[in-house]
Structure formats: C-alpha cells, structure tokens
C-alpha cells in the first residue's frame, strides 16, 4: 500500500493514461485502494434505471477512481507538478511541504 500524500481538495494533474495532462480537484481519497477520484477526470457513461419514486432513468457521466501513482500534486505558487514531503514544525505538528517551492501546503 502506497503512502497517500494527496488530500481531498488538492489540485492534481494526471501524469499517465487516457487523461494525461488534465488537471482537476480531488473529490475523494480511497486510501484502502490507493486511489483518488478527481472532478472531471476519468469519466465513464453509466446507465441508470428509472426509479418508482419518480427518478428518471438515462445515461449519466460519472468519475471513476484513478490510482494514486498516476496523479501528481500541482504546486499553487509555481503552477507545476511537484512531490510532497512531510516535516515537523517545532517538533510537534506534522505538515506537508512542496519539494519544488518549499512552501507549507
């Protein structure tokens, strides 16, 4: 299992696969599967059956999970992809730091 350094709300870029180069915001992190769901990325058409409660059926687009190794964090200051590292501030609190810019995330 990979160490998950990307959190919900982070902007990421797809670095491999059919959506390579596209950017989006992380909606959900599936830590047990080492996958993330990114808004507008890895869309699939799903057929939905009509419901008795009045929900109409049809075809909807849905985001599918992407493996964590196929996305990279986008540094907000430089707008480039970067790696993330952890360090302790004052020996107490663990914070995420961008390796490219050195800023606290």
UniProtKB/Swiss-Prot annotation:
It comes from the Bacteria. PROSITE patterns: RIBOSOMAL_L24. Pfam families: KOW, ribosomal_L24. SUPFAM superfamilies: Translation proteins SH3-like domain. One of its GO terms (biological process) is translation. InterPro entries: KOW, Rib_uL2_dom2, Ribosomal_uL24, Ribosomal_uL24_CS, Ribosomal_uL24_KOW, Translation_prot_SH3-like_sf. Keywords: Ribonucleoprotein, Ribosomal protein, RNA-binding, rRNA-binding. GO terms for molecular function: rRNA binding; structural constituent of ribosome. The keyword Ribosomal protein applies. One of its GO terms (cellular component) is ribosome. Gene3D superfamilies: 2.30.30.30. One of two assembly initiator proteins, it binds directly to the 5'-end of the 23S rRNA, where it nucleates assembly of the 50S subunit. One of the proteins that surrounds the polypeptide exit tunnel on the outside of the subunit. Belongs to the universal ribosomal protein uL24 family. Part of the 50S ribosomal subunit. This is Large ribosomal subunit protein uL24. It comes from Orientia tsutsugamushi (strain Ikeda) (Rickettsia tsutsugamushi). The lineage of its organism: Bacteria, Pseudomonadati, Pseudomonadota, Alphaproteobacteria, Rickettsiales.
């Amino acid at each position: 299992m990979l160490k998950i350094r990307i959190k919900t709300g982070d902007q990421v870029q797809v670095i491999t696969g059919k959506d390579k180069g596209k950017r989006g915001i992380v909606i959900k992190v599936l830590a047990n599967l080492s996958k993330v769901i990114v808004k507008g990325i890895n869309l699939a058409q799903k057929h939905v059956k009509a419901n008795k409660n009045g929900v109409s059926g049809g075809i909807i687009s849905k985001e599918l999970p992407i493996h964590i190794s196929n996305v990279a964090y986008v540094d907000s200051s430089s707008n480039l992809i970067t790696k993330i590292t952890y360090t302790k501030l004052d020996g107490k609190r663990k914070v995420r730091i961008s390796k490219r810019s050195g800023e606290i995330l």
